[in-house]
């Protein structure tokens, strides 16, 4: 880089450009409990040292810029700058490194995921010295966690509201996702709920289109919920998507859902944005509504292993911003998800404390303090034959959503729902009796078919359906 040149004798300021690593690469730095820590996967351009790239990431995501500026002398850079404090090569990869960066807590606004992401990933990903950059993980210190309220209610409060214990929850996304009238949509909801599901769901792109305006959908769905509750004696819900083109309209839809007595609403948190999501989570907490979160657009951000943001970071951001449910992948269905990695961020969603575990992609131990847990939602290409694996992988504190796996039943929606409910309860009972679902799951399902014709029909339809493709994003 160009040498420094002094512009005025006696000022102590030297104009020019200097290497980032002279200021922002500090391998002797001892991280503080209050630091926000980030793990970046870097791919430097040929000829650019890893130390310079790591320092550039730290600089450009905190106090630095491309040239020396005289206003650096007006602040305490050592107090406010980000620091690249460690580098490690990625095993099995040429010219890839994990850069560990520590950020002082004072760089971030309290209770603002928007500001957190604007600072850490807002600009640095376009830096020319890097061929690719991916944010693999964040350590959120307890001091910063305590500035957020997180989930409106959390897992235990949700179970208390629904009076459902000892098993996973069952859901279904109504299909076709677009094109149904509000009345036919409500009918599909009713059939699924009376058949044994706990929830039905708007798809992520169901908002307020010409074929079905939001208010009409809300009214027919409310009718379906009250009718199915009266028939079954169970509390039912439907994830009414309150996502809208502006925050005022979003809150209006949430208010109507509340006035109709609905227990839960839904939000697309990535497409709508963190500010909108935190606003809605605050409303839901105050008004007693559960909040289901869909991750539409996540794969644009997280699927490529060398560039973007890993979903575990997006999941942590959601736990801060607020949501009672979050889609997490299934491991066994049609959507991307490696088992160890998925289990890693599922624990980060649910547990109060998670230890560092690189085998599961967890770069830092994470203490969530008192932030409520978020229930993972397994959805996408799953059916009754997947139930043993889902129960074994996710346990009880999860919502298992079978869209096509309910609505595609040859006898209709209600029998499809019944088949899933029987399969879930059979697998839960078998697990509680000490049986190994990974090894005996097929036998458990086949035995349950003998006293559930609905399940037997579902098993016959989907006996050959598998989604066996290599995972793109691996450790």
Swiss-Prot record:
Binds 1 Mg(2+) ion per subunit. Residues 1-2 form a propeptide. Pfam families: RuBisCO_large, RuBisCO_large_N. It catalyses: 2 (2R)-3-phosphoglycerate + 2 H(+) = D-ribulose 1,5-bisphosphate + CO2 + H2O; D-ribulose 1,5-bisphosphate + O2 = 2-phosphoglycolate + (2R)-3-phosphoglycerate + 2 H(+). The modification N6-carboxylysine is found at residue 201. It is an enzyme of class 4 (lyase). InterPro entries: RuBisCO, RuBisCo_large_chain_AS, RuBisCO_lsu_C, RuBisCO_lsu_C_sf, RuBisCO_lsu_fd_N, RuBisCO_lsu_N_sf, RuBisCO_lsuI. Gene3D superfamilies: Ribulose bisphosphate carboxylase, large subunit, C-terminal domain, RuBisCO large subunit, N-terminal domain. It comes from the Eukaryota. Mg(2+) binds at residues 201, 203-204. Transmembrane segments: none annotated. The modification N-acetylproline is found at residue 3. Its EC number is 4.1.1.39. SUPFAM superfamilies: RuBisCo, C-terminal domain, RuBisCO, large subunit, small (N-terminal) domain. Keywords: Acetylation, Calvin cycle, Carbon dioxide fixation, Chloroplast, Lyase, Magnesium, Metal-binding, Monooxygenase, Oxidoreductase, Photorespiration, Photosynthesis, Plastid. PROSITE patterns: RUBISCO_LARGE (PS00157). GO terms for cellular component: chloroplast. One of its GO terms (molecular function) is ribulose-bisphosphate carboxylase activity. CDD domains: RuBisCO_large_I (cd08212). RuBisCO catalyzes two reactions: the carboxylation of D-ribulose 1,5-bisphosphate, the primary event in carbon dioxide fixation, as well as the oxidative fragmentation of the pentose substrate in the photorespiration process. Both reactions occur simultaneously and in competition at the same active site. Heterohexadecamer of 8 large chains and 8 small chains. The basic functional RuBisCO is composed of a large chain homodimer in a 'head-to-tail' conformation. In form I RuBisCO this homodimer is arranged in a barrel-like tetramer with the small subunits forming a tetrameric 'cap' on each end of the 'barrel'. HAMAP family: RuBisCO_L_type1 (MF_01338). This is Ribulose bisphosphate carboxylase large chain. It comes from Ostreococcus tauri. The gene is rbcL.
């Amino acid at each position: 880089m160009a040498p420094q040149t002094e512009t005025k004798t006696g000022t102590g300021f030297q104009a020019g450009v200097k290497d980032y690593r002279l200021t922002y690469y500090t391998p002797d730095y001892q991280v503080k409990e209050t630091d926000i820590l980030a793990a970046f996967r870097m791919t430097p351009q040929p000829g650019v040292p890893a130390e310079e790239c790591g320092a550039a990431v730290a600089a450009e995501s905190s106090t630095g810029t491309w040239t020396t500026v005289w206003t650096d002398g007006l602040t305490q850079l050592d107090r406010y700058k980000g620091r690249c404090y460690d580098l490690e090569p990625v095993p099995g990869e040429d010219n890839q490194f994990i850069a560990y960066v520590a950020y002082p807590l004072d760089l971030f606004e309290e209770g603002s995921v928007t500001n957190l992401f604007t600072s850490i990933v807002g600009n640095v990903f376009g830096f020319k010295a890097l061929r690719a950059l991916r944010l693999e993980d964040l350590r959120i210190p307890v001091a910063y966690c305590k500035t957020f309220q997180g989930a409106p209610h959390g897992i235990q409060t949700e179970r208390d509201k629904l009076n459902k214990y000892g098993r996973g929850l069952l859901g279904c996304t109504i299909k076709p996702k677009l094109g149904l009238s509000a009345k036919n949509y409500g009918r599909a909801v009713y059939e699924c709920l009376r058949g044994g599901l706990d929830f039905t769901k708007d798809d992520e792109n169901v908002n307020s289109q010409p074929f079905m305006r939001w208010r009409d959908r809300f009214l027919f769905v409310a009718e379906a919920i009250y009718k199915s509750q009266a028939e079954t004696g169970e509390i039912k819900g439907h994830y009414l998507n309150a996502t809208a083109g502006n925050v005022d309209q979003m809150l209006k839809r949430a208010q109507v859902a509340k006035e109709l007595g609905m227990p839960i609403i839904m939000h697309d948190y990535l497409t709508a944005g963190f500010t909108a999501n935190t606003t809605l989570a605050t409303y839901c907490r105050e008004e007693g509504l559960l909040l289901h979160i869909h991750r539409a657009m996540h794969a644009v951000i997280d699927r490529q292993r060398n560039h973007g943001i890993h979903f575990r970071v997006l999941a942590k951001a959601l736990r801060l911003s607020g949501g009672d449910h979050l889609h997490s992948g299934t491991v066994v269905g049609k959507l991307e998800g490696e088992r160890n990695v998925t289990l890693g961020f599922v624990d980060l969603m649910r547990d109060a404390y998670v230890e560092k575990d690189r085998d599961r992609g967890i770069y830092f131990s994470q203490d969530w303090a008192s932030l409520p847990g978020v229930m993972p939602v397994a959805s996408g290409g799953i059916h009754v034959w997947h139930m043993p694996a889902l129960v074994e992988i996710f346990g009880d504190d999860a919502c298992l959503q079978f869209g096509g796996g309910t609505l595609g039943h040859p006898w209709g929606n209600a029998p499809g729902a019944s088949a899933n409910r029987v399969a879930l309860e059979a697998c839960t009972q078998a697990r509680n009796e000490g049986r190994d679902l990974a090894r005996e799951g097929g036998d458990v399902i086949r035995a349950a078919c003998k006293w559930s014709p609905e399940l037997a029909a579902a098993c016959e339809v989907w006996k050959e359906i598998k989604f066996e493709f290599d995972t793109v994003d691996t450790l």
